[in-house]
């Protein structure tokens, strides 16, 4: 279970998923872990909630009935650059994961993801990558 100190001073979390049962179950589990949860079942609902203020954390389903979850990721990233965003989907594909991360998602999980996995992904503090070498190795040198 997450400690409040791990979550930080702003425990706000937006959950966006059109599977109402999953959304409610995950919301209850995340509240028990110390998050202050807002729920949206569509891109449109998420946009309305974002107008009231962007959360510190978000979990967004990729495929929603009224659009693409990446639209929510993009809107959230514009509203709050430091938000930690996890994208969920039942349709795992590398290309989609790459697109989600390029748009600003912190992580990408396949459904069914449990609350512990989601919490770990939201709170993970990835290490920064080392800078590229000044003289990168060419493909010819690797042969």
Predicted regions and their residues:
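AAA+ ATPase active-site-proximal loops
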Residues: 132-143
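Active-site beta3 strand of CheY-like receiver
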Residues: 54-59, 64, 86
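Acidic, metal-coordinating helix/loop segments flanking the phosphotransfer/catalytic sites
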Residues: 39-57
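The feature encodes the CheY-like receiver
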Residues: 23, 65, 89, 93
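Acidic catalytic/metal-coordinating carboxylates
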Residues: 42, 68-71, 89
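C-terminal output helix
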Residues: 95, 112-122
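Short amphipathic alpha-helix used as the core "switch/output" element in two-component signaling
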Residues: 48, 70-82, 99
């Amino acid at each position: 279970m997450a400690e409040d100190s791990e979550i930080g001073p702003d425990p706000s979390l937006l959950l966006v998923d059109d599977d109402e049962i999953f959304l409610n179950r995950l919301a209850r589990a995340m509240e028990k872990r110390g998050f202050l949860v807002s729920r949206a079942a569509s891109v449109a609902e998420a946009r309305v909630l974002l107008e009231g203020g962007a959360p510190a954390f978000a979990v967004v389903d990729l495929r929603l009935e009224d659009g693409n979850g990446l639209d929510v990721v993009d809107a959230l990233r514009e509203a709050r650059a430091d938000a930690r965003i996890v994208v969920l989907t039942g349709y795992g594909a590398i290309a989609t994961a790459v697109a989600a991360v390029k748009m600003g998602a912190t992580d990408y999980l396949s459904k069914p993801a449990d609350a512990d996995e989601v919490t770990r992904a939201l709170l993970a503090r990835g290490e920064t990558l080392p800078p590229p070498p000044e003289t990168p190795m060419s493909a010819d040198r690797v042969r």
